A protein has these predicted regions:
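Generic hydrophobic-segment detector
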Residues: 37, 45, 50-53, 96, ...
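Short, low-to-moderate order helix/coil transition modules at the start of elongated helical scaffolds
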Residues: 2-220, 224-230
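Conserved beta-strand/loop scaffold segments within soluble protein domains that form the structured core
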Residues: 120, 127-398, 412-442
């Protein structure tokens, strides 16, 4: 494209230019922080230069064909500071009895948090000073531009070490609350969990908002397992209706290690999660389940890559979407099997239920195989509620609303029932039932 065409393109979309200028202004506030080491400032500057060079995602990017960030870019989000904390902080919004590490408007609240025995909690700054690779370690390479932006602007976060002695029957919850504020804010949290060899843990990562105004969370979560360590990770995205939630979830699984990830999404006007899994050691295993619940004009997008790099590794992927009204969603699932990953066993399935004629679903399961002794399958299906099934339930005495709700429940239960912890499972089911009630009775 020559300079004239570039000028015309820029004139047609001045909001892209204005959005970048606004981010530059916000970046300057964190880049000038006095308490940070110079090496971290250099890292931030390098990452932001990289983000500016790449720019915001464009429609001609294959992974972003069906997701636009135009409304997000047009909104002048301000980077949150500790001055944005409410006068009274309360997490008593539910009855979950789990140890909870609480973030409010992007900022960790140690005095309001409960830390279980057997884990070590450090701020990102402390871990960076100990070893920069603990916080970065090449996560930005080939990733979403928003992961790079998180590196540049990460304004909160924790590094967690979980030892072999940790009693995994007690789940650990990381709760991110966004409260009502007078102007749109953004946060770039980073959560890193390192599992020792033979360690086990149940993790809940939850995002919630009670603001009716727009805000933006751009989160990065990294879970690294040691050899023979096991993690159950439930990620719940239930942001406020006007929020934007962009995320990068990174799993690195060691030999004989296993991660069971479950992604529940019901909130935000715009939601996108780039999930990148690397099976690093022999007999590493990953399970990825997802349940996306969208309505009105919500848009939800999962872009998933599972990289099989060693022999005898297994992966299972099941993502289900339920779309109501004029909502839309995207599923991109990609399994890569390297030449050294013989005996790989990989399966991915995407099933989608449309509750109306105006909902839109884009599904693209992919296999990329460079080994010859593997078992790999993938499939996708999209449809509406069966009229025959509805008729049968009506003939058994159910009213139309109850019959519809029963069928939708049956569709979702395959994901919810696979959550291993009963209290987390019940909590997730209540969230789903609340959403379903709004759809069927609203």
């Amino acid at each position: 494209m020559n300079w004239r065409k570039k000028a015309i393109a820029g004139w047609k979309k001045p909001w892209l230019h204005n959005g970048m200028k606004h981010l530059e202004k916000q970046f300057s506030t964190i880049a000038s922080a006095e308490h940070e080491p110079q090496s971290l400032k250099n890292l931030r500057n390098s990452a932001f230069d990289s983000f500016k060079k790449t720019g915001f995602p464009k429609k001609n990017w294959e992974a972003w064909r069906f997701t636009t960030v135009a409304d997000l870019v047009k909104t002048p989000f301000r980077l949150s500071t500790e001055a944005d904390l409410p006068e009274v902080i309360s997490k008593s919004l539910d009855n979950l009895p789990f140890p909870t590490l609480l973030f409010v408007n992007g900022h960790y609240q140690p005095d309001e948090s409960t830390q279980p025995k057997g884990i070590n909690v450090n701020t990102l700054i402390d871990s960076y000073n100990e070893d920069a690779k603990l916080v970065t370690n090449g996560f930005d390479s080939g990733s979403s531009p928003f992961t790079v932006l998180n590196t540049a602007m990460m304004n909160s976060g924790l590094h967690i070490r979980i030892s072999e002695d940790f009693e995994n029957h007690t789940p650990i919850r990381f709760l991110y609350l966004t409260t009502k504020l007078s102007e749109p804010i953004m946060n770039h949290p980073r959560l890193i969990l390192d599992m020792a060899d033979n360690a086990q843990a149940n993790i809940i990562e939850e995002y919630r908002g009670d603001s009716s105004d727009s805000y933006w969370n751009n989160a990065v979560t990294v879970i690294r397992t040691g050899n023979n360590s096991k993690v159950h990770h439930v990620r719940i995205q239930n942001e406020a209706p006007a929020a934007s939630h962009l995320a990068s979830t990174i799993y690195e699984v060691g030999a004989k290690g296993a991660i069971h990830g479950c992604f529940i999404s019901a909130g935000a006007a715009l939601y996108r999660n780039d999930v990148n899994v690397t099976l690093l050691g022999e007999r590493a295993d990953v399970t990825l389940n997802g349940l996306c619940l969208s309505r009105e004009t919500q848009h939800m997008d999962h872009n998933i890559t599972v990289d099989h790099t060693s022999e005898h590794v297994t992966s299972r992927m099941l993502f289900k979407y339920i779309l109501a009204e004029k909502s839309s969603a995207v599923f991109n699932g990609r399994a890569v099997v390297r030449s050294d990953a013989q005996k790989t066993d990989a399966d991915q399935t995407n099933k989608n239920l449309l509750l109306g004629n105006d909902a839109l679903m884009y599904s693209n399961p992919q296999l990329e195989i460079y080994a010859d002794d593997v078992r790999c399958t993938h499939g996708s299906s999209t449809g509406q509620i069966s009229e025959d099934a509805l008729f049968y339930l009506r003939s058994r005495g159910l009213d139309a609303v109850s019959a519809k709700a029963l069928l939708i429940n049956g569709f979702a239960n395959e994901v919810v029932d696979d959550i291993n912890n009963e209290e987390i499972r019940d909590y997730t089911r209540r969230l789903f039932e609340s959403w379903l009630s709004g759809v069927t009775h609203g």
